[in-house]
């Protein structure tokens, strides 16, 4: 240990605060908190503790500097540690998945007819709104939202659509919504449905069942049979939900149970969420390289986890976390009610901790098995493509264009077989005019590799979505910049990046694989573009319609490598390629929508580029601009009454341009005149899922700015 570090250890204050450990390059590798900085930090270097952890044994070699921040209280230290971990993302700290991986249901109770909305857990909580969750998967929130909307009949349309709808949507026709947007619905009656939904989402189904049964009996006694039937359906749905839930505690309390399982530096923290005594959710959180004590890891985890979800009355933990009292104060302050951290040693609550620990162990085993399969897939890609090393950092690039217009490129990244969205990039093609995919790809790869040279980091493998021509364009870009695409025999440590082209499967000729050309009724041959053999027979064509396997083109090889169908290497590469295609298409559609928006607004006098962008940000769609009132238009940034009146008059003049519905706005509209429609419940469910998917759409990280 150098003299400067020894001096800092000697001068540490015996006060609460946070400490930042830095490596010799100045990067923060660990952030911790303490009620006494002197005692906590010195304990890592105390040979009398008998601590044999690998990280502590390497502290002398790893640690380059130490920084401390004194706080006024232990509670401030808890809050500061949370912020420092999010800011520096230290290597040895617990880091939860990105906040946008967690989703919640929001109910804005300030609205007279509130609805459930899907929101990211990281969004700032609004006063007067109630939140349920978080849900760790889109499928779980889909199931919950579908059931609530089906049986409690809350509206699904946005506030903007609610304010401007002229006729009820299909949900009204199939008795899934009372259509408060059009018809007069008693606020008290709707509020009753909201309260029922809240009780269901909070896990208080027992109270809800009793109340529903009483209201059903009352409606039947009053000869209101339709209302009684609706309440019966709600009651049956809630009772079916109760049958699926296991009661673990007789006291019906709300608590989370934390389990922890460790092997070496890797560990899993399991959270069992219990509401009204029933297990509602279970989430496993795996972490690597966690050399610090379990009590520090647990304290950091609880502070981060409950930042975006409400803490229950009790949190059962397997051991007392660092600064447990201050942590409980922070959680209570966030929640607005008291939160207790308990470490039971015997009884039913101790049994719950054992259940959580066994679940954590099971999650640990599943996590490591997944890691093994991922390592095997990377090794299989290395063997199949004759690579010089395992492709731990892979990127894939695709071009999207429409008749040469609005050409864009996309780049997606995978590290260790998992999406690395921080390195996703979007490119506007700048130097190519017309339809020239090869030149566009050359430009995109040139820009990517130029940035990589500036950063001093090259990926292991770049996959090009395309065949030999696209691969050659990318190789030419690498050659122009002097980027090696194979390891140097004389300098094996020199950086290089390998490139391959992944071509999609296609219809091919041949008796064993089917034929790409089919014969019609008059003997005319045509390209086969039919979905399946049944469609071919219906249209009078004869074809087996088999597809070729996926093909990978390698530099310097004439024939492509044909990957085994359903193999791990094909699945990994196809997943990377499909993600690049999705990312490019999404960006291209966004640009088309913006261009269409701008072109219509160009006809409005007095509306410049700045106000066009403000309208797009505020409303998001031309249809919503057209439906807006002058008062709503005047609320847009940079707009006054005069500009608002000009826009409103433009869209409401007799020869106004027709505007197509350019995005979903909740459920589909009912037939004119309120008559029945042919929309099925499946179509309605799809509309609801479309709204969820839109809310859960990945936010494109770090887009490449256009010139």
Curated annotation (Swiss-Prot):
The UVR domain, residue ranges: 206-241
UniProt-annotated stretches for the region Disordered: 655-707
Pfam families: GIY-YIG (PF01541), HHH_2 (PF12826), UVR (PF02151), UvrC_RNaseH (PF22920), UvrC_RNaseH_dom (PF08459)
Main location as per UniProt: cytoplasm
Lineage, highest ranks first: Bacteria, Pseudomonadati, Myxococcota, Myxococcia, Myxococcales
Protein name in UniProt: UvrABC system protein C
Name of the encoding gene: uvrC
GO molecular function, one term: DNA binding
Function text: The UvrABC repair system catalyzes the recognition and processing of DNA lesions. UvrC both incises the 5' and 3' sides of the lesion. The N-terminal half is responsible for the 3' incision and the C-terminal half is responsible for the 5' incision.
Assembly behavior: Interacts with UvrB in an incision complex.
GIY-YIG domain ranges (all copies): 14-94
One CC-aspect GO term: cytoplasm
Keyword Iron: no
Subcellular location, record wording: Cytoplasm
Keywords tagged on the record: Cytoplasm, DNA damage, DNA excision, DNA repair, Excision nuclease, SOS response
Similarity comment: family membership: Belongs to the UvrC family.
Biased composition (Acidic residues): 690-707
Entry-linked SUPFAM superfamilies: C-terminal UvrC-binding domain of UvrB, GIY-YIG endonuclease, RuvA domain 2-like
Composition bias type Low complexity, residue spans: 660-689
